[in-house]
Amino acid sequence: VEEYYEFLINKFEKYKKIKIHNFGLLDKTFETKISKLGAGSSIFTRSEGVAEQKIFIKAATEFIKEEKLTEIDLLYMNIEGSEYQLLANLIESNEIMKIKHLQVQFHNYVDNSKIKRKEIRKQLNKTHKCIFNFPFIWERWDRRK
């Protein structure tokens, strides 16, 4: 969302090591619309009378390769239902191994969210250790040594 992007550019302008990108990450590259609901903005939820904006989504695996990322210290993920697609893709591509610390909020309004979360947690447990788990609130995972 354009105004969130501008806000972050201004907030982090002093920090030269921080790069802000005006796109989201998922399992594939495409354009879509997002509902503008502040912290609850989502490509999954639509409400009558709520403003929407066209946004660009880039495949996370493509972004990791383009940026030549070999290690990601922290992936903080509160992406309003898109976490299932993104994590499944990172696990399947083995890019998950580049992530040292993962903090994720799973959302339960997505179809089959309990089943999807259970499967992702099972896969994550092979590469990462769960540090804390408050189901559908917050979870923290650290890469196994």
Each predicted region: which residue ranges?
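Phosphate/nucleotide-binding beta-alpha loop and adjacent structural elements of enzyme active sites
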Residues: 1-145
